Structures are given as structure tokens and as C-alpha cells.
Amino acid sequence: MCTASRPRIAVIVVAAGSGTRLGAGSPKAFVTLGGRTLLERSLHAVRCMREPAQVVVVAPEERLAEAAALGEAGFGAAVDVVAGGETRQGSVAAGLGALREGVEIVLVHDAARALTPAAQFDAVVAAVDAGGAGVVPGLPVSDTIKRVGADGEVRETVDRSVLSAVQTPQGFPRDQLVAAYAAATTDETDDAELAAAAGHPVTVIPGDARAFKITTPWDLRRAEELLAGLAAPRIGFGTDTHAFDPSAELWLAGLRWEGEPGLAGHSDGDVVAHAIVDALLSAARLGDIGGVFGTGDPRFSGAHGEVFLTETRRLVEEEGFRIGNVSAQIVGNRPKFAPRRAEAETLLSRVLGAPVSVSATTTDGLGLTGRGEGVAVFATALLLAP
């Protein structure tokens, strides 16, 4: 969620289109898909971006209040809303006029690309940062493309190896996009064309098949079918075991336990957090904690369990799920967990935005935990469609 008062990134979400080809009788961004409008679904991805962003929604003038309410519902916080222009280009120009001081990178996104994952937004930002120029996501063209005359006669077969079907969000350094719009003398089909016409380089990076534009009734049915595949609840299981390390501090269930021996590990050794992460990743079919947060990544050396849980929640939500509930059971002789159970459950529930229950037991002296050599945790997680 965007919480920074002066974010360096802004996302302009264009939601002013009439939706004539969709035939829904209302502007396209306000059409419902699986119980939520296209605008809400588009903003959900923005909410899951790694870095906070200012959000500017460009909507029809007569629906600004509705756009503000839907924007807050989808983004989870208030968004800036401005009236659109006569054309898409005019609408984006209106959005540019609402950018706050301090914004350095601008992403322009079509609300009609409602299933675009947050990872695509993050990839565009990273590419703009790396290259200092415009970036658009695109997919290879798989169909054979013919150039035809007005009479329908084929004039040429275009080499599809040099073609890319571009998507949004399209990202640019703010100064370049503002300059391109100021210099525009004709309406172009997208922002990348405007930037290129103004002499600014634009690079294509790999896009995502889910970022297709919902323009026709067939597109809407396709999106509904994709969402239907996410509708069934997902259950994941995770486990983790760490040996005691008397030289380390003990972190367990997000809490520091003074006077107790710590657990060995690349991070803080919080086995409760790690088992929950594995359960969530398993339910979302995202792999496991080792594959996602490998021990070779210095960003997570010594990191607390809350860091892993926060990022895992973001990844799960990026895939289109919400966390239903989580249950974890600690197996070990120490520490005595019952006195701090409520404290741990409150912290974990806050981090994950869902109910978390934690219980504890022993193995009556059997095995590694029974001998007092370490702690094991088993966790289950339930994921639901948003």
C-alpha cells in the first residue's frame, strides 16, 4: 500500500474509456469482473507493488466520485482522481497535471488491463531505473502478419520476429514524458510512440499474457475464465526445524525471547515465520522459502521473520489470492509459549492481514526436539480468491 507522503513513483490509471466495443452500457473501467470492477482489479496490482506510488485515476467527469470510492477500495487508500479528456492522450495529460512534487518515474496503465500482475509494474520500474529511458512491456507476435491494401489485397508479409505486441504499464522518467506530451502535435496510439516522436529512446521488456486488454465481450469472458481458476480455496503445508545456537538471540513467532538460546540460521532463525512462509508459498504454487529467499541473497542475511512474512504476503496477493487463515504448531521443550501466545498471534495476524493461530506441544522426550536440541514447526495456510 502507498504510505509514503512523497513517493518517487506515480501510476496514472486511465479509466475514462467509453467501453463501446464491450457493449456493457457503461464506461469500461466500471464494468464488473468476478464481483469487482476492472478499475478495482487494476489498482489491486498497484497496491502490491514493491515500492509505494502515488496513484492518479483518470475517469469520466460525471463519475469522479464513484471512481474515488472504487479507487480507495481497490488500492486500500485514497487515490487522486481527475477528469479525463476527449482522447486517451488528453486523459493522460490530465493525469500528468496531478503529479506530486518528488515523483521521478511515471507509469501509465490502462484500467482495461485488469489482470496485469504487480510483478509487471515492478519490472517496468526497475527497467526505467536501470536505463533512464522509456520502457514498455511486450509479448512476441505469434500470428503471421500481413500488410494489406484498401482493396484487401496482400501487399507484404511482415517479419514477426521484429514485432512486439506492447502492453501497459508503460514507464518513463517524468521529465521525458512531460516533455513528450508538451511537444505532441498529433494523437498517437500510446505513450511510447509519443516519447519516441519526441526523440526519447524506448525499450521493450518481456510482458505477461495476463495483461491483455479487455475490449470486447470475448475478452471479458476470457478474464472471467481465468479468475474462475483461482476461485477454489488453496491449502498449503509448511514445516521448518532449527537447532539451538546459544550464541544467538531467540526470535520465535515474530517475538524476541530474552534469556533463551537462539536458533541457528541464515536469518534470525524464526522457525514459526519460516514454516508459515512455506505454507503460504505452497498454497499459491510459488515454490518454497529456499527458492524464493535463497541463502545466497544478502538482503535476507539476519532478516527477521516479519520481513519474510511481509514479502510473502505481497507475493501471494500479487498472484490474485488473499490469505484466509494460518495455523502453526510449535514442537519443542522451550521456550514456554503459552504466556505469550496472544501476543504472538496478534503480531502475526497484523503482518499477514488474516487470523493466525499458534499452538505448542512436545514429543515426550523423543527426537531432536524431545532431547532439547532444537525447535520444529508445522504450519497450514488457507488462500482464497480476492
Swiss-Prot record:
Per UniProt, where does a divalent metal cation bind?
240, 242, 274
Q: Needs which cofactor?
A: a divalent metal cation
Q: Which Enzyme Commission number(s) are on file for it?
A: 2.7.7.60, 4.6.1.12
Q: Which UniProt keywords apply?
A: Isoprene biosynthesis, Lyase, Metal-binding, Multifunctional enzyme, Nucleotidyltransferase, Transferase
Q: Where is this site: Positions MEP for the nucleophilic attack?
A: 160, 213
Q: Name one GO molecular function term.
A: metal ion binding
SUPFAM superfamilies in alphabetical order: IpsF-like, Nucleotide-diphospho-sugar transferases
Which Pfam family is an annotated match for this chain, by its short name? YgbB
Write out the ranges of the annotated region (2-C-methyl-D-erythritol 2,4-cyclodiphosphate synthase): 234-386
Say which domain of life the source belongs to: Bacteria
Listed under catalytic activity are: 2-C-methyl-D-erythritol 4-phosphate + CTP + H(+) = 4-CDP-2-C-methyl-D-erythritol + diphosphate; 4-CDP-2-C-methyl-D-erythritol 2-phosphate = 2-C-methyl-D-erythritol 2,4-cyclic diphosphate + CMP
Q: Does the keyword Ion transport apply?
A: no
Q: Specify which residues bind 4-CDP-2-C-methyl-D-erythritol 2-phosphate according to the UniProt entry for this protein.
A: 240-242, 266-267, 288-290, 361-364, 371
List the disulfide bonds in this chain. Answer: none
The record's region (2-C-methyl-D-erythritol 4-phosphate cytidylyltransferase) falls at: 1-233
Question: According to UniProt, where does the site described as Transition state stabilizer lie?
Answer: 21, 28, 266, 362
Protein's pathway = Isoprenoid biosynthesis; isopentenyl diphosphate biosynthesis via DXP pathway; isopentenyl diphosphate from 1-deoxy-D-xylulose 5-phosphate: step 2/6; Isoprenoid biosynthesis; isopentenyl diphosphate biosynthesis via DXP pathway; isopentenyl diphosphate from 1-deoxy-D-xylulose 5-phosphate: step 4/6
What's one GO BP annotation on this UniProt entry? terpenoid biosynthetic process
Q: What does this protein do?
A: Bifunctional enzyme that catalyzes the formation of 4-diphosphocytidyl-2-C-methyl-D-erythritol from CTP and 2-C-methyl-D-erythritol 4-phosphate (MEP) (IspD), and catalyzes the conversion of 4-diphosphocytidyl-2-C-methyl-D-erythritol 2-phosphate (CDP-ME2P) to 2-C-methyl-D-erythritol 2,4-cyclodiphosphate (ME-CPP) with a corresponding release of cytidine 5-monophosphate (CMP) (IspF).
Q: Which family does it belong to?
A: In the N-terminal section; belongs to the IspD/TarI cytidylyltransferase family. IspD subfamily.
- For this entry, the protein name equals Bifunctional enzyme IspD/IspF
Organism annotation: Leifsonia xyli subsp. xyli (strain CTCB07)
Q: Which gene encodes it?
A: ispDF
